[in-house]
Amino acid sequence: MKHLTEMVRQHKAGKTNGIYAVCSAHPLVLEAAIRYASANQTPLLIEATSNQVDQFGGYTGMTPADFRGFVCQLAESLNFPQDALILGGDHLGPNRWQNLPAAQAMANADDLIKSYVAAGFKKIHLDCSMSCQDDPIPLTDDIVAERAARLAKVAEETCLEHFGEADLEYVIGTEVPVPGGAHETLSELAVTTPDAARATLEAHRHAFEKQGLNAIWPRIIALVVQPGVEFDHTNVIDYQPAKASALSQMVENYETLIFEAHSTDYQTPQSLRQLVIDHFAILKVGPALTFALREALFSLAAIEEELVPAKACSGLRQVLEDVMLDRPEYWQSHYHGDGNARRLARGYSYSDRVRYYWPDSQIDDAFAHLVRNLADSPIPLPLISQYLPLQYVKVRSGELQPTPRELIINHIQDILAQYHTACEGQ
């Protein structure tokens, strides 16, 4: 499993290539990604976050072993080679247990790392940047690095125990703000300074030495930094290369290291390409993919209303709204304003809090009902043109079947195509 170290080697040799990481557990998003990678004969990096998947089940109800089984089964059903599939764990550390004392939180983090590594995840992002209940705020670089080194030692030992070799690839550091898009309205964003990036690296190098982990330094392939990209509910802060140029140049002095950029969702194709050229060569994408899924489903729901008598419709949008109002915990603290503003945010926000609700059984039933209603007879071309114009062009040229499922998957793949192009290199 050397796809990532090989990518870094090529990038360092001047290829201006990169890799994107699909950060989603939604079956249709994953199917879209696997099929896209298969068609383009590229490796595929799929990541689970410590919120989604942990030793207790996370919010998806899946342990790392469950998630791996789920992804591998899907890949196998689509004839995707297992050796081209890379699984990553994102923000692994005490993130889920910040309300506990540090000793307890880190004991849980040890077990989290063990469960990810034992399940066969090979790209491990060590993130101990968050303060626990009895910690100072913010933590010093040294404390963060010591905790990361402790987890790296656990990871190495677990990997040797289960697989007989230590072949993990690590990412260290964190971005600001918190994972998953900003809560507040943004207008400008501080880019990580070269000094801060150097301090993080040196603190980690020193902490790894103290743990006797010198030999793994070449397998620390990336540092997470903030290149100045973010999104909130209705705005995107676009990458401005000039603001990140000093940071970009700084990493050129490290022969086995590139940068990883989080929250790259909704950047323009030109910005994505420039990020990779500027050594932010691992691009994380998640909400933009489920946002595209949601767009396609809303479009199909509108088509359904044109074609199917009201009483036979799935009512997907209303079911979704009702469930989100019944169980507001995933959006309530994120969306503000009056009732109408919050209604719009629930449906259309870039932060896409609706992604937490797709697994709900009522919503899943409505989705299945929608697909059944539209699969019974061909969808009229003018309606595809009206509601899914990008897919219409491909349907007309004969490259896309106009079935509900294929329309959804292709709409998601339009986003993946932007990332693929950005990462291809020269």
UniProtKB/Swiss-Prot annotation:
Q: Per the record, what is one GO cellular component?
A: plasma membrane
Instruction: Return the protein name.
Output: D-tagatose-1,6-bisphosphate aldolase subunit KbaZ
In terms of Gene3D superfamilies, this protein maps to: Aldolase class I, putative tagatose 6-phosphate kinase domain like
Q: What does this protein do?
A: Component of the tagatose-1,6-bisphosphate aldolase KbaYZ that is required for full activity and stability of the Y subunit. Could have a chaperone-like function for the proper and stable folding of KbaY. When expressed alone, KbaZ does not show any aldolase activity.
The annotated subunit structure for this chain is: Forms a complex with KbaY.
Coiled coil segments of this chain: none
The record ties this protein, via InterPro entries, to: Aldolase_TIM, GatZ/KbaZ-like, GatZ_KbaZ_carbometab, TagBP_ald_KbaZ
Q: Which GO biological process annotations does it have?
A: carbohydrate metabolic process; D-tagatose 6-phosphate catabolic process; phosphoenolpyruvate-dependent sugar phosphotransferase system
Family matches, as Pfam families: GatZ_KbaZ-like
Signal peptide (from-to): none
Pathway of this protein?
Carbohydrate metabolism; D-tagatose 6-phosphate degradation; D-glyceraldehyde 3-phosphate and glycerone phosphate from D-tagatose 6-phosphate: step 2/2
The text of the family note is: Belongs to the GatZ/KbaZ family. KbaZ subfamily.
